[in-house]
Amino acid sequence: WDKITSDSSESCLLNRATQGLYPPGSTYKVLTALEYMEEHPNSYKNFSYECDGQTIVNSVRISCYENEEHGEVDLDRAFAKSCNTAFVTLGSKLDIKNFVSLNKKCLFNQEIPFDLAVKKSRFELTQNSDKSEIPQTVIGQGNTLMTPFHNALLMCAVANEGTLMKPYVVDHVEGADGTTVKETIPEIYADLMSEKDAKKLQKMLREVVTSGTGYNLDTDLYTAAGKTGTAENEGKYAHAWFVGYSNVEDPDLVVC
């Protein structure tokens, strides 16, 4: 029983969407970017960084994927290209107290109300953490773990201009004659970010698809926005992520 319900490749009965906990990799940069914009509302556009593929921050060596050199990047470009070195540079200067508060607000270490059991995502950085933990954390590595369900909910909030609706499974129940006997009424669960910041993230997520790492989704068949991620897995196969939404003008579907 443990073999088929534990989090391993042979676990055929594990609901990975709600029960699997994985390092989010670069999909976590959504929150790092959000915190940076909240702390620098009038100057975040002035961020500039020269990427040569690797850097050392707080005695930790960080490289971009395959040591790719992105050259000079601003925040939007660093996000679209998923530039690790740019993000650890800006992330190392964040107000840790505010950053911890943002992660709590965005459902880390929290019970998520849902019809199915959901494991708590883990965010372990605190004001007392060693500074060497910060570089890995801000790019979605280190001790941070998320369920795909949680990651999808964060994207729902971004697509919905900052407001997260309470998730549910059953839309309505019908009687034998086809009439609706019970209906789930959508309700607001929480405002995770301001509408202004959500719209900034929407633009950045769109650029991931049109000119960044999510280019495979750039098609005439539909429009999409989102964030890619690759998380190291202790010498095993890496965890590959994509979280995003379709129909960018009027978002209708979030996937993770």
Tell where the protein language model's regions lie, with residue ranges.
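Beta-lactam-recognizing serine transpeptidase/beta-lactamase-like catalytic domain environment
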Residues: 1-26, 31-256
